[in-house]
Amino acid sequence: MGAIMLLSGCCCRDCCRHNACCREEKTVKRSEPITMTMKKKSAKEIIKEAYGKVAETGSSCAVIGGGCCGGGCALSADVGYTREEIDTLADANLGLGCGHPVSLADIKPGNTVLDLGSGAGFDAFLAARKVGEKGKVIGVDMTPAMLAKARENAKKYKFDNVEFRQGDIEKLPVEDNSVDIIMSNCVINLAPDKAKVFKEAHRVLKSGGKMAVSDVVLLKKLTKEQKDDPKLLCACVSGAILKDDYIDMLKKAGFEVTVVDEDKTINKKWFGDEKLPISSLKFTARKK
């Protein structure tokens, strides 16, 4: 799970003809965008409803509306996924990420990997290929429709070393000291209490275990109007916090943080000419 795009435009049909976003029958009209205000529903309720619609339709157009919203394949290729990864797991790729955390994780055969906000299973399945038969991948997501889609995809792609659990990343349904690697792709920004997420991550990681994360952070504070916009919440913007605050939270939770890369052009890629002070941060964080 990750960013619901506000983009509109053509699908990448030539590179991803099987992707759900590229199926004409899945295109959702602009008559269905989010209309609720932040005051009427909690952030978690808004996110759950929005991503439930994405899971059911296979497109972020279910929430934002407009064309094909960029195409999952094109967006995924732009943040680092290979053509082979995209083509072989097309139904699991909803184009909701802001990076490629699996490539940061250095996953080994036999590892236990936890995916925070696992969505339709794309990153979880890529990790499952690396952990092999002796390893295990656990995906946690709070949206029932996403979990159903992920489990359906696990059967379709024949992954028996992946388990999807319903839960909140602020209160993980995972045992203490049981995970080698935690990965997450454009999800932690959606959590209202990020400090809790990092404390929970520290709890479930084994000694020396690490996080490998791509996430949206702010380069400067948003306006009140931007903070209160539910569409920007679901698009991984209004729930984001300042980069320095994000890193400080990780350190306070007991992690040694290494910033691997940062994409300050993500705003233009996602929103075109709309100027939003966001960056896609790629980092690892090792449990001390």
Where in the sequence are the language-model features?
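Short, glycine-/aromatic-enriched active-site segment of Class I SAM-dependent methyltransferases
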Residues: 218-237
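Conserved SAM/SAH-binding beta-strand->alpha-helix loop
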Residues: 143-145
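Hydrophobic beta-strand segment of the Class I
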Residues: 113, 182-183
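Conserved SAM-binding strand-loop segment of SAM-dependent methyltransferases
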Residues: 157-170
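Conserved alpha-helix/loop element of class I SAM-dependent methyltransferases that forms part
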Residues: 71-112, 122-126, 130
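A short glycine-rich, Lys/Arg-flanked "PGG" loop and its adjoining helix->strand segment in the class I
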Residues: 195-210
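A short acidic, Gly/Pro-enriched loop at the edge of an enzyme's catalytic core
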Residues: 109, 170-181
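Short alpha-helix
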Residues: 238-254, 258-260
